[in-house]
């Protein structure tokens, strides 16, 4: 079983190849409005390194936002193309879940990914004994919104931590029609 994981919703370009529950290739690269220049060459680099083709993957997981309009379109276009042309099942996940998947310790977590003009993409969740409880689902709010929380680890653009092996299968959504798939732009308060 091989899985391709992609997300370009923020300044972070994330790619992971998972084979039999082991990450065999991973790229976590910060960029500024240049994911379209790097995504396909980095995927190709991983394929060449492991002597694979996209046909060798059984599943694609795509972070669908919320996030930057152009950034979301980059990985979404690639994932949809691979899924449609090669008949590979495509699953979506909130980018906020994916970009915070490396946080596993007990505690409260406040995702605060910078949007524009004083706003953030936010999610609040608590982890207790390995179980994740969502307190507030994906939101587009003012930067000061999370000040209402007296405690919690703030996850921002500076400390995104992805662990593609820690993706909760319950957070995945199978895409029935790749042509109808749209990013989660989340632009309303």
Go through each PLM region and give its residues.
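N-terminal phosphate-binding loop and adjacent alpha-helix
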Residues: 32-48
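Phosphate/pyrophosphate-binding loops at sites that engage ATP/ADP/AMP, CoA/4′-phosphopantetheine
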Residues: 43-59
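Short glycine-rich phosphate-binding loop at a beta-alpha junction
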Residues: 55-64, 150-158
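Phosphate-handling active-site elements
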Residues: 50-55, 84-95
């Amino acid at each position: 079983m091989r899985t391709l994981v992609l997300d370009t919703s923020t300044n972070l370009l994330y790619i992971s190849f998972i084979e039999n529950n082991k990450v065999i290739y991973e790229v976590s690269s910060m960029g500024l409005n240049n994911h379209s220049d790097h995504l396909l060459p980095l995927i190709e680099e991983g394929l060449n390194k492991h002597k694979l083709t996209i046909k060798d993957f059984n599943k694609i997981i795509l972070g669908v936002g919320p996030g930057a309009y152009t950034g979301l379109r980059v990985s979404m276009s690639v994932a949809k193309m691979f899924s449609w042309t090669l008949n590979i099942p495509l699953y979506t996940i909130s980018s906020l879940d994916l970009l915070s998947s490396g946080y596993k310790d007990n505690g409260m977590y406040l995702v605060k990914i910078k949007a524009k003009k004083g706003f953030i993409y936010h999610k609040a969740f608590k982890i207790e004994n390995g179980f994740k409880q969502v307190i507030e689902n994906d939101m587009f709010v003012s930067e000061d919104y999370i000040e209402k929380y007296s405690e919690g680890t703030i996850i921002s653009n500076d400390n995104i931590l992805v662990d593609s092996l820690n993706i909760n299968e319950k957070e995945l959504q199978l895409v029935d029609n790749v042509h109808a798939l749209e990013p989660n732009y989340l632009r309303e308060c």
